[in-house]
């Protein structure tokens, strides 16, 4: 298994994560509240590896996390929302709120699953921003665990839950104890409390 610590989070070390993403692999990385698993959201090969690793159903859809709003342009249909809606959403980013928004018509079906909206977040958490900025696009963000189990909060738990076949970015998780809040971008309903 390959992993490294934040002390060594130099560009060349981050490139191990980026290269794994480009090679359609799954990576583990710290998020604001737990370790996450991520991959290229546009790669069916990578998504299939993620689904297999987590033993997760493909019809659930995924959250994608970005370094900035412009990275979401290929995924969300802003024309379907009023300026007021967009302002309410965008003023929470970067931040720890995931929004369900209308998707672009041509996005990969596995991102929304059986849902009509896509789950997106712009993070301000340093490791996520760094990965997405260097990768040049958002990544999938799902908890590092087998589907239905408690998410991993450290490297030892990742190894125990998922084995040693993924690259892990070893860095402390953020300050939150719960996953991100999820809100509906059309009616502002809270789907999952943060």
Swiss-Prot record:
InterPro entries: DHBP_synth_RibB-like_a/b_dom (IPR017945), Sua5-like_dom (IPR006070), TC-AMP_synthase (IPR023535), TC-AMP_synthase_SUA5 (IPR050156). The keyword Cytoplasm applies. Keywords: ATP-binding, Cytoplasm, Nucleotide-binding, Nucleotidyltransferase, Transferase, tRNA processing. GO terms for cellular component: cytoplasm. Pfam families: Sua5_yciO_yrdC (PF01300). GO terms for biological process: regulation of translational fidelity; tRNA threonylcarbamoyladenosine modification. It is an enzyme of class 2 (transferase). Required for the formation of a threonylcarbamoyl group on adenosine at position 37 (t(6)A37) in tRNAs that read codons beginning with adenine. Catalyzes the conversion of L-threonine, HCO(3)(-)/CO(2) and ATP to give threonylcarbamoyl-AMP (TC-AMP) as the acyladenylate intermediate, with the release of diphosphate. This is Threonylcarbamoyl-AMP synthase. It comes from Wigglesworthia glossinidia brevipalpis. The gene is tsaC.
